[in-house]
Amino acid sequence: NVASGNDSSRKKKYLDELKKISKGTVTVQQEHFYLKPGNQARLEFNLVAEGLRKIALLWQLIKNGTLEKGAVLFWDEPEANINPKFIPEIVKILLMLQEDGVQVFISTHDYFLAKYFDVLKNNKDAVHYYSFYKAAEETGKEQICVEQASSFKLLEHNTIMETFRKLYEDEIGVSFK
């Protein structure tokens, strides 16, 4: 359980990881959220960069016990407005939540976020990749299809990988298919 007790070691581990990214802690006073970076004065959430607000909100959801075994987290493009150097840390935290019984759904168009799940997951992690794409029916109309794989690289309809490959080809002037 992620949040068992006020000072559970598991919760502390999450909060410590998130504190490395946000460089502060989250406080709530009179239903207003604040980020307190180190020894600086607290900042209202609306004055904090969007990426830090996301991290601070995740911090608060863990701190208050919302994200515990059986909970579901939906996160649309967690990489948006986040410094790319923190992507591996975010993936580690999401994998930890999954290990603790939180069901995590993310959507992304980011190669690095998707690939870090492949790199950092272990055999016991329940990570699945889904690709939604349009395909022509026999009638000539397009339909939405879905493909599922246990690894990012195994998706056949993978526009993220196709775009990354195209960039690489453009950069070195060679075609890889």
Name each model-derived stretch.
Residues 69-72, 101-105:
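Loop/turn-to-beta-strand initiation segments
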